[in-house]
Amino acid sequence: MELPAVNLKVILLGHWLLTTWGCIVFSGSYAWANFTILALGVWAVAQRDSIDAISMFLGGLLATIFLDIVHISIFYPRVSLTDTGRFGVGMAILSLLLKPLSCCFVYHMYRERGGELLVHTGFLGSSQDRSAYQTIDSAEAPADPFAVPEGRSQDARGY
């Protein structure tokens, strides 16, 4: 199934809006973490061909999924919530729920920009071509293992 084309600017605008509303209740480290990642997203928009920018934004989104879970679970106000507080918490949770979908779209953009597959299954798949390397069980042994390289005399030591 092919993912629909979603503009990176739409993802940034949506998460910026939800993060701003989430900061009504969760300020401090929640705001720093999310707005820093959104700044990486602005960098990814500014440099359309940069694999580094989009990969940093993708990694940051993945990290903020974990960080948002921690922030919401630790700093959730348990005593009394006003309607504004409930709205802010709801927007922070909605932002958290939309981040995995955003990660899928951003990963698709990463692949379009020329990024490689992040998940390597080398031990399950076929082995890499190592024809340029000499095997350990090679029958070719050096003629004289203590031979002096050309252009160096016996008294020139490397230590």
Curated annotation (Swiss-Prot):
Q: Does the keyword Signal apply?
A: no
Residues the record lists as Phosphoserine modifications? 126-127, 138, 153
How is this protein situated with respect to the membrane?
A: Multi-pass membrane protein
Q: Give tissue specificity per the record.
A: Ubiquitous but more abundant in kidney, heart, pancreas and thyroid.
Query: Which ranges sit in the Extracellular compartment?
Result: 1-23, 77-86
Q: Report residue spans for region: Interaction with AGTR1.
A: 110-122
Query: Which stretches are transmembrane?
Result: 24-44, 56-76, 87-107
Q: Where does the record place the modification Phosphothreonine? A: 135
Q: Which GO terms describe its molecular function?
A: angiotensin type II receptor activity; identical protein binding
Signal sequence region: none
Q: One biological-process term from Gene Ontology? A: regulation of blood pressure
Q: Does the keyword Thylakoid apply?
A: no
**What's this chain's function?**
Appears to be a negative regulator of type-1 angiotensin II receptor-mediated signaling by regulating receptor internalization as well as mechanism of receptor desensitization such as phosphorylation. Also induces a decrease in cell proliferation and angiotensin II-stimulated transcriptional activity.
What protein am I looking at? Answer: Type-1 angiotensin II receptor-associated protein
